[in-house]
Amino acid sequence: MTDLRHYDVIVSPAITEKSTMASENNQVVFNVARKATKPEIKAAVEALFNVKVTGVNTLVRKGKVKRFRGTVGRQSDVKKAIVTLAEGQSIDVATGL
């Protein structure tokens, strides 16, 4: 897989209070492409950040229905990946991709 494809798999780091707490357990949370699979996510993180990944868990957050000036709209679904790193490995997501 090329580096360009790796950048298509990982959209952005998810920086929330919950993901900050997960970093204490050697886990990093990323927003990923909806069609990305666990092996693709693992390969992309290992290639882009030069770390060893021991596990990948994924979830899909369904978009909410929102109203703006009487018009009903819907937010997009978001797929997140919780990546567990090997002992001694770390990624500083604050610096960006």
Curated annotation (Swiss-Prot):
Its subunit composition reads: Part of the 50S ribosomal subunit. Contacts protein L29, and trigger factor when it is bound to the ribosome.
- Gene3D superfamilies, A to Z: 3.30.70.330
From which source organism is this entry? Answer: Chelativorans sp. (strain BNC1)
Q: What is this protein called?
A: Large ribosomal subunit protein uL23
Entry's family note: Belongs to the universal ribosomal protein uL23 family.
- InterPro entries under this entry? Nucleotide-bd_a/b_plait_sf, Ribosomal_uL23-like, Ribosomal_uL23/eL15/eS24_sf
One of the record's GO molecular function terms: rRNA binding
- The question of whether Ribosomal protein is a record keyword is answered with yes
Q: Where is the signal peptide?
A: none
